[in-house]
């Protein structure tokens, strides 16, 4: 009886964690888009608020012994903090300038770029099956972007820069975690305030401080509430991702990611009336097929690697 109650409690915690991640990951996209469309809130300032809220959330977490901070030299994570700024700023600019469908599909291109970076600069090898899955992923993104009736050059530039900087950031995060022997929360705890400091210096040069569109402008209570809510949700996204990776299998995490991808796309078309042509639909289907194939082959290779290790004498 005690075992069954323990299993039930454990499953309930996992379901709750997945639900928090689902709601926060989807809400952050829609709320940010809503803030850009209806209030025109400055992008870099919103990113700065996200960083500050994330650090405050992590500070509370470490006080509650959810994780133990590890002392790190600022010089060791300087480049990582800069790339973190670029990754979030350009990703948000892509969301601001593109439809949610194009924004979501552009993010998928992070996988092919990471593979290219790891192949060229880290001498990492990938199987032919993995490389072939990049064809439908890339083709689908191109199809969707080409037939997007709201296509704009600046949006594509922001999306491209977002993909490049995000890919570099993700590669460097993995390398730094291994080099410094820290987990993602310990790294983010030091990285978030450094990134906040960088943006605090840059914001006055790129965005107005007062008047319409400025951080100290005449914002309504609802606009400020939405911005603060966005910051809280940004923290929940980071926290729930860390929790899911630590408490579920890679299959659960990846399959759940595909579910969120589809829900976010659907929500963009429903909430913001983003137009969807037949060719765009084919592009989305093509990309999703590539993502599923990539996940299947990647997980199969990981399981094969584990079985080889266990079979060694």
Curated annotation (Swiss-Prot):
GO process annotations (BP): transmembrane transport
Keyword entries, A-Z: Membrane, Transmembrane, Transmembrane helix
Main localization, broad class: membrane
SUPFAM superfamilies per record: Multidrug resistance efflux transporter EmrE
Claim: DNA repair is one of the keywords in the record: no
TM helices/strands, residue ranges: 14-34, 40-60, 77-97, 100-122, 130-146, 153-173, 187-207, 215-235, 252-272, 275-295
Membrane topology reported for the UniProt record: Multi-pass membrane protein
Gene Ontology cellular-component terms listed: Golgi apparatus; membrane
Location in the cell: Membrane
InterPro entries: Sugar_P_trans_dom, TPT_transporter
GO molecular function (one): antiporter activity
Top-level taxon of the source organism: Eukaryota
Similarity comment text for this entry: Belongs to the TPT transporter family. SLC35E subfamily.
Described purpose of this protein according to its UniProt entry: Putative transporter.
Protein name in UniProt: Solute carrier family 35 member E3
Organism: Danio rerio
Higher taxonomy: Eukaryota, Metazoa, Chordata, Craniata, Vertebrata
């Amino acid at each position: 009886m005690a075992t069954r109650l323990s299993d039930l409690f454990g499953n309930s915690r996992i379901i709750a964690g997945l639900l928090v991640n689902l709601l926060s990951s989807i809400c952050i996209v829609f709320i940010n888009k809503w803030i850009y469309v209806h209030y025109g809130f400055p992008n870099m300032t919103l990113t700065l608020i996200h960083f500050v809220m994330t650090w405050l959330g992590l500070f509370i977490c470490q006080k509650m012994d959810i994780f133990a901070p590890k002392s790190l030299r600022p010089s060791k994570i300087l480049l990582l903090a800069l790339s973190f700024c670029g990754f979030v700023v350009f990703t948000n600019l892509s969301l601001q300038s593109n439809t949610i469908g194009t924004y979501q599909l552009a993010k998928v291109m992070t996988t092919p770029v990471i593979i290219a970076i790891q192949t060229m600069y880290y001498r990492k090898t990938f199987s032919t099956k993995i490389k072939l899955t990049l064809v439908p992923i890339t083709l689908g993104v191109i199809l969707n972007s080409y037939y997007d009736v709201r296509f704009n050059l600046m949006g594509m530039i922001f999306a491209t820069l977002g993909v490049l900087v995000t890919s570099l950031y993700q590669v460097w995060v993995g390398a730094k975690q291994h080099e410094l022997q820290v987990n993602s929360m310990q790294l983010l705890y030091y990285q978030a305030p450094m990134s906040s400091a960088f943006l605090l210096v840059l914001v006055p040069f790129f965005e107005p401080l007062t008047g319409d569109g400025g951080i100290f402008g005449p914002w309504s209570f609802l606009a400020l509430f939405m911005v603060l809510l966005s910051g809280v949700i940004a923290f929940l996204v980071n926290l729930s991702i860390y929790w899911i990776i630590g408490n579920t299998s890679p299959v659960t995490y990846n399959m759940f990611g595909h579910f969120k991808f589809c829900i976010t796309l659907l929500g963009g078309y429903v909430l913001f009336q983003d137009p969807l042509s037949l060719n765009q639909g084919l592009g989305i289907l093509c990309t999703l097929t590539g993502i599923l194939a990539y996940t299947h082959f990647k997980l199969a290779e990981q399981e094969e690697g584990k079985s080889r290790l266990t079979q060694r004498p």
